[in-house]
Amino acid sequence: MKPVAPRSFFAMDFLEFITAWEGKWLSQRTNYSFEQNEAGNAKSDVTVQRWDSQTELGRSLLERAGLKNQGELILLQLSWDNSVDWGKSKQKGTIYYGFLPDADHGDRGQLWRGTTNSNLAFLRGDYHLGSDECLTLNLGDGETSLTERHWYASPNLRLRTSLIQQGEGYSHSAFYSDIRRLPPAE
């Protein structure tokens, strides 16, 4: 019997892929520190919201990222709260992603990630939505590089991995499963 190739759950373009990020998610993470030879796990509530790059927040982040007015910029706010993880120290935070699609290739473009905290550096890099329907983010600041891969197992289950490299070796890896709690507000 001839093996059957798995049916693609989604056939999304980049904008549809990013739009599917929006909403409230329960995120479960398993991570490993190569430097400390230590594994861990955590869970948190994650909220992803899209912002207009022309708002005051959008203009402020563009300025911090060193970008001029970019009409095609897609700006996402990702906030997390690990209060759902009983027995762990509580952490809340917010990070922003800015995606600037390539005019000739809509499945790739420039990327930056940062916060409104002026003491923390923005990471810059690129992204690519592959034919395997996996979004790869490559970010760095010179000595540290971060590679994240995001994909959907179903409309309400997003999976992702991250790998941090410092110098010649890897320092940290993580696997996340994100279960949608609420779709984005209409």
UniProtKB/Swiss-Prot annotation:
Keywords: Lyase. Belongs to the CpcS/CpeS biliprotein lyase family. One of its GO terms (molecular function) is lyase activity. This is Chromophore lyase CpcS/CpeS 1. It holds the Pfam family CpeS. Covalently attaches a chromophore to Cys residue(s) of phycobiliproteins. It comes from the Bacteria. It comes from Synechocystis sp. (strain ATCC 27184 / PCC 6803 / Kazusa). The keyword Transport does not apply. The gene is cpcS1. Gene3D superfamilies: 2.40.128.20.
